[in-house]
Amino acid sequence: MAAKIRQNDEVIVLAGKDKGKRGKVTQVLPNGKVIVEGVKIITKHEKPVPALGKEGGLVKKEAPIDASNVAIFNPKTNKADRVGFRFEDGKKVRFFKSNNEII
């Protein structure tokens, strides 16, 4: 099955503490989760690893959120949008459902 949300898509968060935030998808995980730039920042406690020269301490990083909690952002309408698929010239393409424009 083709993915409706892919890496480098601009998305908007629909639910959770970061609702309304926009960001670029940096990674799509196989378990149905996505990592979005600047969204769901968590603080991890890292142990020092002297062999690799890593210092320990608190590290801020993005945590994965469920793909159902994000929607692709349509720059023409400035709103969240749904994604559809269709064939054009023998190729499967994604399009915005609100204005039928190819992504």
From Swiss-Prot:
Give the gene symbol: rplX
GO MF annotation list? rRNA binding; structural constituent of ribosome
A single GO CC term for this protein reads: ribosome
Q: Do you know which Pfam families this protein is assigned to?
A: KOW (PF00467), ribosomal_L24 (PF17136)
Answer yes or no on keyword RNA-binding.
yes
Key words of the record: Ribonucleoprotein, Ribosomal protein, RNA-binding, rRNA-binding
**Could you say which protein family the record assigns here?**
Belongs to the universal ribosomal protein uL24 family.
Q: List the disulfide bonds.
A: none
Q: What does this protein do?
A: One of two assembly initiator proteins, it binds directly to the 5'-end of the 23S rRNA, where it nucleates assembly of the 50S subunit. One of the proteins that surrounds the polypeptide exit tunnel on the outside of the subunit.
Q: Which GO terms describe its biological process?
A: translation
Protein's UniProt keywords contain Glycosyltransferase:
no
The UniProt subunit note reads as follows: Part of the 50S ribosomal subunit.
- PANTHER family, per this entry? MITOCHONDRIAL RIBOSOMAL PROTEIN L24 (PTHR12903)
Q: Which domain of life is it from?
A: Bacteria
Instruction: Give the species.
Output: Actinobacillus succinogenes (strain ATCC 55618 / DSM 22257 / CCUG 43843 / 130Z)
Question: What PROSITE patterns would the database entry show?
Answer: RIBOSOMAL_L24
Q: Which NCBIfam families match?
A: rplX_bact
Q: What is this protein called?
A: Large ribosomal subunit protein uL24
* SMART domains in alphabetical order: KOW
Which InterPro entries does the record match to this protein?
Answer: KOW, Rib_uL2_dom2, Ribosomal_uL24, Ribosomal_uL24_CS, Ribosomal_uL24_KOW, Translation_prot_SH3-like_sf
